[in-house]
Amino acid sequence: MRFTIIIPTCNNEATIRQLLISIESKEHYRILCIDGGSTDQTIPMIERLQRELKHISLIQLQNASIATCINKGLMDIKMTDPHDSDAFMVIKPTSIVLPGKLDRLTAAFKNNDNIDMVIGQRAYNYHGEWKLKSADEFIKDNRIVTLTEQPDLLSMMSFDGKLFSAKFAELQCDETLANTYNHAILVKAMQKATDIHLVSQMIVGDNDIDTHATSNDEDFNRYITEIMKIRQRVMEMLLLPEQRLLYSDMVDRILFNNSLKYYMNEHPAVTHTTIQLVKDYIMSMQHSDYVSQNMFDIINTVEFIGENWDREIYELWRQTLIQVGINRPTYKKFLIQLKGRKFAHRTKSMLKR
């Protein structure tokens, strides 16, 4: 078996060496490092490792996004001799392959001609110990499934821990998206796959530090707009209600609400721009399936973290909620009730300690 590992890099000097030396397999493999324009020591590090280790190739691009780098790697697979790659992986430069685990994927892939994808578990670094990511807990044993049979796969919108048939190199990441560029390509691959082999082993560990894409107003606006765009696109791709609910749950709860919490903790003063953006998101949810609890969690995030409400901004918020069937009192009554709710919440939190 022959397979290719694509690693998109850009200023990853802190982690790239650890990843490259962690890759080992009994199969014939090659590593394509596609750099998007690093200005640190990433490229010199890769070049030094090329002299120490076999299989590493480096392609340098300028001002290229992660999606562009991955697409370059996929194009390379398509353009080379078909016998050079039976399969491929894409691994983040902040990840590491856990010892002896890569061949768990390759063994499963070789075991059955109908296997088009092999998916293992992902881990995160918790105080020096690898812990299973909660989104991967549904992989409890080794088994063969399809997306229809296992819609939980839609909670795993990451390349890490996945081995793809080389025929999926024809697919492309969305270069117009900075953060969710891989959602559509992953869904298409899952839908096209004849069979998907699940491996109940932690394959890849993630050393990434969560820097958040929502640290300032401009980034937050761009990020939320992107989430709305990809959410609508993928929801239109999914035919079964259960699939749409699982995907929307992941996007609404993890991507949107978690980012909203982070942003509002950094910028608690409620502004017209923030409320308008949340309104746009809530209204976009109405055009597709969603978990109702996620709607209430988003509302709680805005009301519990938000500060410095004024009458005009509150009225915009109140009318938004009325449009989706949720009543809110007048401005003064809202402030009184909110103060009471926050006090009760703090008291409950103190009693739990």
Swiss-Prot record:
Q: Which SUPFAM superfamilies match?
A: Nucleotide-diphospho-sugar transferases
Please name the CDD domains in this protein's record: Glyco_tranf_GTA_type
Signal sequence annotation: none
Biological processes, Gene Ontology terms? cell wall organization; regulation of cell shape; teichoic acid biosynthetic process
Extract one GO molecular function annotation from the record: glycosyltransferase activity
Q: Name one Pfam family in it.
A: Glycos_transf_2
Q: What superkingdom does the record give?
A: Bacteria
Enzyme Commission number, as recorded:
2.4.-.-
Q: Which PANTHER family match?
A: GLYCOSYLTRANSFERASE (PTHR43685), GLYCOSYLTRANSFERASE TAGX-RELATED (PTHR43685:SF11)
The Swiss-Prot or TrEMBL record describes its family as follows: Belongs to the glycosyltransferase 2 family.
The protein in question is named Putative glycosyltransferase TagX
